[in-house]
C-alpha cells in the first residue's frame, strides 16, 4: 500500500463515520500548490459552500504562493463566512486522510475562530 492509498483508506473510514452522524461536512483537500475547502450537505450530495486558494478574491489577499499556512488561514475564514451565509453553523471536519498538522490545522483553526463549530 503506497502513501496515497493509505490516505484514501483513512478518508473512507472518516467519511463513513460522518455519514452515520447525519451532519454537514467540512472537507479539506490539499495539493502542493493550493488548498481547497467545501461544505457538503448532510446527505453528502450537495455543496453548500466552497473556498480555495485558486479563487481570484483569495489570491488578491495573498502575496505569493497558495500553499502556505497563511493561505490556509485565509481560506478557513472565507469558508466559515460562506457556510454561515448558507445557514450552516455546525459541521463535522473531514481532513480527507491528511494529518491534522500544518496547513490543514491552520484552516481548521481559522474556521473555528470565524464561527464554525466542530
From Swiss-Prot:
Keyword field: Ribonucleoprotein, Ribosomal protein, RNA-binding, rRNA-binding
Q: Which GO terms describe its biological process?
A: translation
- Chain ranges passing through the membrane: none
A single Gene Ontology molecular function, please? structural constituent of ribosome
Q: Which CDD domains match?
A: Ribosomal_L18_L5e (cd00432)
Description of how the protein assembles with itself and partners: Part of the 50S ribosomal subunit; part of the 5S rRNA/L5/L18/L25 subcomplex. Contacts the 5S and 23S rRNAs.
User: Its function?
Assistant: This is one of the proteins that bind and probably mediate the attachment of the 5S RNA into the large ribosomal subunit, where it forms part of the central protuberance.
The family assignment reads: Belongs to the universal ribosomal protein uL18 family.
Protein name per UniProt: Large ribosomal subunit protein uL18
The taxonomy runs:
Bacteria, Pseudomonadati, Pseudomonadota, Betaproteobacteria, Burkholderiales
User: Gene behind this chain?
Assistant: rplR
